[in-house]
From Swiss-Prot:
Stretches that traverse the bilayer: 8-28, 110-130
Protein known as: ATP-dependent zinc metalloprotease FtsH
Residues given in the record as Zn(2+) binding sites: H423, H427, D499
Membrane topology label: Multi-pass membrane protein
Binding positions (ATP): G201, P202, P203, G204, T205, G206, K207, T208
Primary location class: membrane
Segments of this protein annotated with the region Not necessary for FtsH function: 514-637
Compartment(s) of residence: Cell membrane; Membrane raft
Length: 637
């Protein structure tokens, strides 16, 4: 926006200057009429001449004057040759009362400027237009210059205190900070500080924030660049930018260089369909040389971030280059609470907001997810003109982050509403009965995003690995919705397609990756689906098992799904009263949280408090007998 404004102002100034110069010349040059010598003599004899000025110009006399009937800005101009003609005019002027005014001498500078100014204006305008066409300045010559941004200001530096939920990761980077502050301490002991630190982890876990905090704590210049900024369409530009980056870093040493998304330039050489990318490989080669080549780069530490460390070139990860890898994972419940406290500093929270409870309800959330959750809560509160963010705003924000905004205006038929209620009720009952299944933290039949309703099924605690019974119970929980539809309505709908997708994926990984098939044994088959595929490397990978094994894999997956389906059917049949109670309550209040579900199962009623903005507790009390009878009436209709 600023650049557009500056360009507009520049063009306006150029236009005003041109208009001013043209106006000046037009106003400074009065109307002049060329008059012949004979006519001038006749007018002079007739007494029509009022005033004249005579000025010698290049061998003639330039006579400029006004007739008595002329306007104020009207003049005549005639030229008189030297000699008798001039003497005749001078003698005639002496005999008349014509005013002879001294000639106005024009300064040489004025003449020069009036001649040169139009050319200067044209040149400046042409130069500016050429500048714009080239993208500014000597852009063609600057292709090889680094695009890294240098941060040296002391204000608004990120510190380690601004990074929460990554205590171990921060500790790993403390050595880097100490080296930048006091390198002699390490040199005296013969220690070599890591030249490169690679931050690996899922998106949104704070890799870039950790790098900024490292530079902020050390108080040194901080160069920031993205991996995609190196490679351009022109050959050799990437390598040139790498050289220029390290040249600038040497001038500002000690310093930090942060390369975000380094996999854009550091992926394996020679990989890719149709061969490698020569320009990218040339850039990578130059980066390898600069990091650990013949010329030492003392005082320069490189921090890079990626979420695809599996595709990086091995030469980039060897000791002497990125010889320290720090895994920045999603925070656990304690880390999530710490992250929430950091992002809640500038937000007024109501006393009903419990950050620890929010942390327990958000397993798997990254730091960016938690920041977005609190920001959404602030937006929800502001939309309702509240002064503080309360627990309801947090709940609404959590739902928006997980499933999208509520579609309260969507028109849903009574039949579809019943199907959704019993579908979500099936998930809920399975979560209540099975100890190893994911627990339902919230269930609703309010449409959100693409879903007609949803149940928030989360692990009971943070898990870093899962047992076979846990995985089987998870599949049973996913199938609970479809089974409930079949038991209650005797028919099934398309609402369970996502449940089937997730359940099938778990069963397939149990058989092909985790070795949990009794028939096939502890073997792994094919490409691990837990890791991401790199097409250039994995395209030509052949199937490492026979067609017979492939058939047996399919049979094992079907067996697991069928057994879990039958198990879910048995559980819901035995607990049909709970299914009816939860489904009918959902049809009345639309949304239930974990506390309400527990109280409903234990006492047959909802707890004595408001559950929605529209309904009071007295209006939503239900019991098993009443709701079962209502269901029978509905099915008769």
């Amino acid at each position: 926006m600023n650049r557009v404004f500056r360009n507009t102002i520049f063009y306006l100034l150029i236009l005003l200057v041109v208009i001013g110069v043209v106006s000046y010349f037009q106003t400074s040059n009065p109307k002049t009429e060329n008059m012949s010598y004979s006519t001038f003599i006749k007018n002079l004899d007739d007494g029509k001449v009022d005033s004249v000025s005579v000025q010698p110009v290049r061998g003639v006399y330039e006579v400029k004057g006004q007739l008595k009937n002329y306007d104020k800005d009207q003049y005549f101009l005639t030229h008189v040759p030297e000699g008798k003609g001039a003497d005749q005019i001078f003698n005639a002027l002496k005999k008349t009362d014509v005013k002879v005014e001294p000639a106005q001498e024009t300064s040489g500078w004025v003449t020069f400027l009036t001649t040169i100014i139009p050319f200067v204006i044209i040149f400046i305008l042409f130069f500016f237009l050429l500048n714009q066409a080239q993208g500014g300045g000597s852009r063609v010559m600057n292709f090889g210059k680094s695009k890294a941004k240098l941060y040296t200001e002391e204000k608004k530096r990120v510190k380690f205190k601004d990074v929460a939920g990554a205590d171990e990761e921060k500790q790993e980077l403390v050595e880097v900070v100490e080296f930048l502050k006091d390198p002699r301490k390490f040199a005296e002991l013969g220690a070599r500080i890591p030249k490169g630190v690679l931050l690996v982890g899922p998106p949104g876990t704070g890799k870039t924030l950790l790098a900024k905090a490292c530079a902020g704590e050390a108080g040194v210049p901080f160069f920031s660049i993205s991996g995609s900024d190196f490679v351009e369409m022109f050959v050799g530009v990437g390598a040139s930018r790498v050289r220029d980056l390290f040249e600038n870093a040497k001038k500002n040493a000690p310093c930090l260089i942060f390369i975000d998304e380094i996999d854009a330039v550091g992926r394996q050489r020679g990989a890719g369909l149709g061969g490698g990318h020569d320009e990218r490989e040339q850039t990578l080669n130059q980066l390898l040389v600069e990091m650990d080549g013949f010329s030492a780069n003392e005082g320069i530490i490189i921090i890079a971030a990626t979420n695809r460390a599996d595709i990086l070139d091995p030469a980039l990860l060897r000791p002497g280059r990125f010889d320290r890898q720090i895994t920045v994972d999603r925070p656990d419940v304690i880390g999530r609470e710490a992250v929430l406290k950091v992002h809640a500093r500038n937000k007024p929270l109501d006393e009903t907001v419990n950050l620890k409870s929010i942390a327990m309800r958000t397993p798997g959330f990254s730091g960016a997810d938690l920041e977005n959750l609190l920001n959404e809560a602030a937006l929800v509160a502001a939309r309702q003109n509240k002064k503080k963010i309360d627990a309801r705003d947090i709940d609404e924000a959590t739902d928006r982050v997980i499933a999208g905004p509520a579609k309260k205006s969507r028109v849903i038929s009574k039949k579809e509403r019943n199907i959704v209620a019993y579908h979500e009720g099936g998930h809920t009952v399975i979560g209540l009965v099975l100890d190893e299944a994911d627990m339902v933290h919230k269930v609703t039949i309010v449409p959100r995003g693409q879903a007609g309703g949803y149940a928030v099924m989360l692990p009971r605690e943070d898990r870093y690995f899962q047992t076979k019974p846990e995985l089987l119970d998870k599949i049973v929980g996913l199938l609970g919705g479809r089974v409930a539809e079949e038991i209650i309505f005797g028919e099934v709908s398309t609402g369970a397609h996502n449940d089937f997708q997730r359940a099938t994926n778990i069963a397939r990984r149990m058989v092909t990756e985790f070795g949990m098939s009794e028939k096939l044994g502890p073997l792994q088959f094919g490409q691990s689906q837990g890791g991401q595929v790199f097409l250039g490397r994995d395209f030509n990978n052949e199937q490492n098992y026979s067609d017979q094994i492939a058939y047996e894999i399919d049979q094992e997956i079907q067996r697991i799904i069928k057994e879990c389906y039958e198990r879910a059917k048995q559980i819901l049949t035995e607990n049909r009263d709970k299914l009816e109670l939860i489904a009918q309550t959902l049809l009345k209040v639309e949304t239930l949280d974990a506390e309400q579900i527990k109280h409903l199962i234990d006492h047959g009623t909802l707890p004595e408090r408001n559950f929605s903005d529209d309904e009071k507790n007295d209006d939503v009390k239900v019991n098993i007998l009443t709701k079962t009878e209502e269901k029978k009436d509905d099915t008769k209709e």
